[in-house]
Structures are given as C-alpha cells and as structure tokens.
C-alpha cells in the first residue's frame, strides 16, 4: 500500500500529494506478474490500517493538529479560504479567533468540535481524503491488473459510516471479524 514520508495520523499518508499517487503506481507494478493467474480471485489492498483503530476519528482534525506542512493541510486551508473568503467569516462560522488563515498552520486540536460548521467542514474534507486513500491505489492496481477483484482493506471495524467512503472502488468490502 502506498505510503508517504509525511504522515497525517499514524500510518495515514498524505493522500493528496503527488508522492502518494506515484507510490501507488509503483506498488501496483508488483501485481503484473500475477495478472493472468487463473488461480487467484483477487487481493486485499492492505490489512487493518492502524489509523482506523480510533473511534469516530475525524481525519481533517488530525491534518490541522499535525504540525507538518502536508499537501492535505495546504488543500484544506485553500478550501476554507475559498469557502469563507475572509478569516472573519471563518471565525464566525467556526467560533474561533484566528488572526489570519496562516494561523491554521499552527497545531489546532479537535477543530471539528468548535462549531457545527467546523464539524461539517472537517467531515467533508475527511471524506475527500478517505476517497483519495482508497481510489488512488485501487485505480493504480486496476491499470496493472484488470483481471482480479479488489477485496477491500480488511478493516478491523467501522466506527463511523464515513470510513466506508470510497467503497465503490472495491469489488468486495471486507471487515475482519474475530468473534
């Protein structure tokens, strides 16, 4: 599964970066040798990502809490600038007191808890990140091997329906069950 040097949270990569896309393509090349194997039905993209072991995780909150200047952070801040236009409008919606949009580069804990608008913005961006997390490697794998199913990521569990974002890229949505 593709990784990036900078992480958003635990093993969650900077999924909106070019590095993630390139690593997805490079990792998918490993499938070429078995693309015509009639004994194989498919493959799992990964197994139980460690970032997903946190109940009700809002990934965009981790973007703003993480001190790294990631591509995800750049795109989140750009989306907020586009939506709100002024820091005053953002402050009103989010119930915050930022001096300017650059304040968003400083670690901010639990941004989605600041207001309903903040929660909506953060959950929307989290879904964009989750979609990229799943879609980019899925497409890279299908380009190399269109003959086998993508069997999902073998989630440990799903604590929030948003974690299923991007499921349409799988042929099978898989969850490990240890009951």
Task: Tell where the protein language model's regions lie, with residue ranges.
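Extended hydrophobic/aromatic segments used for targeting, binding, or gating
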Residues: 156-179
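Conserved thiamine diphosphate
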Residues: 17
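Polysaccharide-binding and catalytic clefts of secreted carbohydrate-active enzymes
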Residues: 9-14, 26, 30, 36-164
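Catalytic domains of carbohydrate-active enzymes, especially glycoside hydrolases
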Residues: 1, 41, 173
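Short, charged, surface-exposed secondary-structure boundary motifs
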Residues: 2-10
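Alpha-helical scaffold elements lining the catalytic groove of polysaccharide deacetylases
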Residues: 20-21
């Amino acid at each position: 599964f593709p990784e990036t040097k900078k992480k958003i949270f635990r093993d969650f990569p900077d999924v909106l970066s070019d590095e993630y896309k390139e690593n997805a393509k490079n990792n998918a090349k490993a499938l070429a040798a078995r693309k015509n194997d009639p004994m194989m039905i498919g493959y799992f993209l990964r197994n139980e990502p460690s970032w997903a072991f946190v109940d009700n995780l809002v990934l965009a909150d981790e973007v703003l809490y993480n001190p790294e200047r990631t591509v995800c952070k750049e795109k989140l801040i750009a989306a907020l600038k586009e939506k709100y236009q002024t820091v005053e409008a953002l402050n009103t919606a989010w119930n915050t007191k930022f001096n300017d949009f650059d304040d968003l580069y400083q670690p901010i804990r639990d941004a989605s808890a600041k207001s309903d608008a903040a929660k909506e913005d953060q959950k929307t961006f989290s879904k964009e990140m989750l979609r990229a997390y799943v879609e980019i490697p899925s497409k890279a794998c299908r380009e190399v091997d269109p003959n086998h199913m993508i069997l999902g990521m073998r989630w440990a569990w799903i604590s929030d329906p948003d974690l299923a974002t991007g499921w349409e890229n799988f042929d099978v949505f898989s969850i490990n069950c240890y009951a």
